[in-house]
């Protein structure tokens, strides 16, 4: 679906994968956000699909490279969001599939350690920090989850409504 204000020189929607790194703390469920390299905006670790890898695995790798987190990724996305990526001569509409990641380990240093900032925040704060409205909506939907929830894995596979 294209937006009404699509720039004339834009290409069709492209696909990316993202990780939604989560951990359980005494405050409740926390989300790991990273800054983008070009503009410094807060977002989730994301990137292009990787040849020879399933999308959920590519999302897991992006989380390790961009945020220094390791864990178990859901094989199914929890949702999607869209954003406009500015290129030299055009804007591309990107649809991003978001895969929850139950974080089991954080690294002291990682591939993009010196290129990005990392922040662990509650879902409601994460929703305020990101600039993509659809991603913010997805993060707000996680806000009611608290430490009393038995297991993050209950969030990993979305329940049908």
Residue ranges and their predicted role:
Residues 1-26:
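Acidic, metal-coordinating catalytic segment for phosphate/diphosphate chemistry
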Residues 80-109, 119:
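Active-site-adjacent beta-strand/loop module that shapes the phosphate/pyrophosphate-binding cleft
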